Amino acid sequence: MNVVKISPRGYCYGVVDAMVLARQAAQNLDLPRPIYILGMIVHNKHVTDAFEEEGIISLDGPNRLDILKQVDKGTVIFTAHGVSPQVRKLAKEKGLTVVDATCPDVTRTHDLIREKSQEGYKFIYVGKKGHPEPEGAIGVAPEFVHLVENVEDVESLDISADKIIITNQTTMSQWDVSEIMKKAMEKYPQAEVHNEICLATQVRQEAVAEQARECDLVIVVGDPKSNNSNRLAQVSEQIAGTKAYRIGDVTELQQEWFDGVETVGVTAGASTPTPITKEVIAFIEKYDPSKPETWTPERKVTLQKILPKVKIKK
């Protein structure tokens, strides 16, 4: 079957940096044990499973602060999504060693909220409720930040302030953010806009918006918890008009999706391991509806091939 390898796709620099830091931590025998990750280092189960094989424990919970309360000793890794100042404070009070893998793009948003809230600004923050990135950003100045996920949330806002900044989670759909920000500006014309969609998210979405038009179907390889992966599928359907499915790996492909399809576009979320995506591409390229031997997807990528190679610090 014909495959369009939508490019750019896959890992962004923030994800790679986070995984390298976590892997260096796993191999650094000087760091106190056990080593924990507060949440998923990046939103991909294959990656977290691979780290567990290296002895790193991924902790889950309703929020980062509650997760950290489970930890009494050792080392904690802050994920690429960032954490609130309250989490940093508690880690320090507990005497824990901290490895900070926060994406620099996320840190920039935290700095904006910290600096401008001290000047009396209120914030309208466009983000996904329940996602760790907004949790960390809002935690910088919770009394100044209002989280909105859609236009309806904007309509229900009641902010009395002359100084307002509208900003956003880095991995949102740029089209959704634009629509929500437009509505917010109509309601609060005095507001300033600081669009914080990261470049990696933006160019991957634009690639899908353009290249998916050439395809009958688009497959997005990414974890269900990965917001940027889910947004890529949304962009394919809503902007390019091409049906899309998000899958975790090759085993989730369904044969009926390919009925009447000649060209399949494949892209991947920013936290999706490259070998997982390559396996999906290879399967679809070999798939032939007239040859039953090509119909059964099988995952052969081992966890050992998931994580980036790192130099052991001596």
UniProtKB/Swiss-Prot annotation:
Pathway: Isoprenoid biosynthesis; dimethylallyl diphosphate biosynthesis; dimethylallyl diphosphate from (2E)-4-hydroxy-3-methylbutenyl diphosphate: step 1/1; Isoprenoid biosynthesis; isopentenyl diphosphate biosynthesis via DXP pathway; isopentenyl diphosphate from 1-deoxy-D-xylulose 5-phosphate: step 6/6. This is 4-hydroxy-3-methylbut-2-enyl diphosphate reductase. Isopentenyl diphosphate binds at H43, H81, H131, S226, N228, S271. The keyword Ribonucleoprotein does not apply. [4Fe-4S] cluster binds at C12, C103, C198. InterPro entries: LytB/IspH. It comes from the Bacteria. Catalyzes the conversion of 1-hydroxy-2-methyl-2-(E)-butenyl 4-diphosphate (HMBPP) into a mixture of isopentenyl diphosphate (IPP) and dimethylallyl diphosphate (DMAPP). Acts in the terminal step of the DOXP/MEP pathway for isoprenoid precursor biosynthesis. Its cofactor is [4Fe-4S] cluster.
